UniProtKB/Swiss-Prot annotation:
NCBIfam families: L3_bact. One of its GO terms (biological process) is translation. Residues 121-154 are annotated as: Disordered. Keywords: Ribonucleoprotein, Ribosomal protein, RNA-binding, rRNA-binding. This is Large ribosomal subunit protein uL3. GO terms for molecular function: rRNA binding; structural constituent of ribosome. HAMAP family: Ribosomal_uL3_B. Gene3D superfamilies: 3.30.160.810, Translation factors. One of the primary rRNA binding proteins, it binds directly near the 3'-end of the 23S rRNA, where it nucleates assembly of the 50S subunit. It comes from Desulforamulus reducens (strain ATCC BAA-1160 / DSM 100696 / MI-1).
Amino acid sequence: MPKGILGKKIGMTQIFNEAGVAIPVTVVEAGPCLVVQKRTPENDGYSAIQLGFGVKRENLLNKPTKGHLNKAGVRPVRFLRELKVDDLEAFQVGQEIKADIFAEGEKVDVVGTSKGKGFAGGIKRHNFHRGPMAHGSKYHRRPGSSAAKGPARTFKGRKLPGHYGVERVTVQNLQVVKVDPERNLLAIKGAVPGPRGGLLLVKNSVKVK
């Protein structure tokens, strides 16, 4: 059954296994999350649950969000995200989901928003090759030709310098090394997208190796 939880990236550290090998891990504060709404095939055309995570002062909520949360009978939450599920009967509105839904050794996919790098050139943004660095060269880090003479314009979708980062990124098949159910912490092997404090969605892997 698909399962997932919203969380916050705490940072990276390392854990030593039984053989004394240091494993780099990312610590994620996973939950607790609240089930705010259930999406049914009859009303919405698909099966999903809406999860709420984080704490937000009630006076900062707008009226539609406040009414939505009051209807569900849950406390004010900072983030609302949907997660597709198969069995809606396993979830109830107001139910709390914690980090103990995952077990040590389980493979997960982590979805986050990548760090923003600002305005970047083609070499950094798209891995372009640079030009000759000789003294006579007038072409070092420029993008080069962007189109032919025939159309006399640049087509949409052309790889050019521009804003880099702040994109939805999914890292697949990461291993859960340790679970701390008391503090709702997950230690996930490797790096995950985004800065410290960034919102993450941790869900069971769809391409288990």
